[in-house]
Amino acid sequence: YIRGSIKHKLLHGHNAPNRKKHIDRIVEKLSCTTISTPYQWFLLGTAVHYIADCFTFAHNEFFTGGMAQHMKYEMLLQPIFHNFVNGLKEPQNKYKTYYFNLSFYHKMYQNENRSFLTDCKYIVSSTEKLLDSLELVKDEVPLLSTQINLAK
C-alpha cells in the first residue's frame, strides 16, 4: 500500500527537492500573523523540521543508501547534533539578517563536504534565518549562527 497512493504523501517536505513548496506555504501562513496558537507553533515546528531535513545528507538526492542506511545516518547524526548545539556559546556581537533564501543556502550546502558537522552547521544557521525572517528573534537576542562559518 505504501507504494501506491500514499507513497508521495509520506515524503512531503522531508526531502530537499520537495521542501520548497511546503516550507513556502507554511511561512506564508505564519508571516501574516503573530504566532500564538498551538497550531501555529506546530506549523513552525514543521517548517523547522523540513529545513533540518533539507540540510541532512540522507534527505538529499546525492545520498545513495537505502532506508536502513538512512536510519543509521540519522541515528548517528542525532547525538552529534545535540553536542554541536550544546557547544555553541552566546555570541558577543549581535547579528540580524532579514532575508531568508533557502534555495541559496541549499546550493551552498550541496557544494560542501558531506559530513555530520556540515549538516549541523546548516541546520542551525538556516533555522535561525527562518526564525529571524518571521521576526521571532528579537534584536537584543544574539544569534548562535554568528559562530558558524558557512563560507568556504
What is each PLM-predicted segment?
Residues 1-152:
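N-terminal leader/auxiliary helical segments
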